[in-house]
């Protein structure tokens, strides 16, 4: 059995989970998330906790039981607390501005970069060099953060670019004559 799948997913107050043979739906105060269930994984609801187990002893089923448990745990956390990802803009003239369902970025290109926000991800810009992404789906929030960072990843000599909050950029030394 997967070591991750051994631990049950405890449902906090206000969060409920419903599942069929095909999918699992988790509802909470912040929203609702659904995900298809793997055919090799068995899910049981026992006293407000979801338990995962492999249906057979194949390596794929054992592996997927741990994966499903981790994904459902992220869904439960998302609908109860939500997820947040912070980005910082480092560089002269690098600015960000939230405009409705889009993010306007000035990143040293000859044109402004407009990144549309997908449904379920909210963006805030407390300052011109700070971006905060919020949502209930951890994968979606992380994907949007990675897409924004990819417009201008931190370069290795001065560290200019878009970086995650707390990210350590290793700077290279310049060439010596």
Swiss-Prot record:
The keyword rRNA-binding applies. Pfam families: Ribosomal_L6. GO terms for molecular function: rRNA binding; structural constituent of ribosome. SUPFAM superfamilies: Ribosomal protein L6. GO terms for biological process: cytoplasmic translation. Disulfide bonds: none annotated. InterPro entries: Ribosomal_uL6-like, Ribosomal_uL6-like_a/b-dom_sf, Ribosomal_uL6_a/b-dom, Ribosomal_uL6_bac-type, Ribosomal_uL6_CS. Keywords: Ribonucleoprotein, Ribosomal protein, RNA-binding, rRNA-binding. Part of the 50S ribosomal subunit. Belongs to the universal ribosomal protein uL6 family. This protein binds to the 23S rRNA, and is important in its secondary structure. It is located near the subunit interface in the base of the L7/L12 stalk, and near the tRNA binding site of the peptidyltransferase center. This is Large ribosomal subunit protein uL6.
